[in-house]
């Protein structure tokens, strides 16, 4: 009987990785939900109660909130993509890795091929983060310009 040197994928390990991927996706969705909720609350405050001086401050706070949630969402997407690579490696769907990248049983560490500033930048510029948060920031800047124009005294 021949001994196969290639390790069969462990279903339990793949299940753990898949659960982590799902959790990262849910976290990214929750980041978007909370961002929209907080921005909506700030804009309601801006329209209802804010004085002239605090209108500008409120818009800048809203832009800061968007930047914070964009960073968080990008991080979750970055991790999700790393765990997808780990899933493919564990399932044996990618070519053999170098010896330094070998995984042990039930290893949940993202391999080096799935980490780095380049991968984080790709996650930041993806449609699900870059377009979503970029559009919100553009709309807030347009609102800032509109409130500035509305407050110019007429002669």
Residue ranges and their predicted role:
Residues 52-64, 154-155:
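Hydrophobic alpha-helical transmembrane segments
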Residues 38, 60-68, 135-139:
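Lipid-exposed faces of alpha-helical membrane segments in multi-pass integral membrane proteins
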Residues 1-45:
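Cytosolic-side membrane-entry/anchor segment at the start of a transmembrane helix
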Residues 10-20, 92-123:
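Short membrane-interface loop/juxtamembrane segments of multi-pass integral membrane proteins
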Residues 45-51, 145-148:
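Structural signal for the C-terminal ends of transmembrane alpha-helices
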Residues 30, 55, 59, 126-130:
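Hydrophobic, aromatic-rich alpha-helical transmembrane segments
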Residues 104-155:
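A hydrophobic membrane-anchoring alpha-helix module
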Residues 27, 58-111:
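Inner-leaflet juxtamembrane helices
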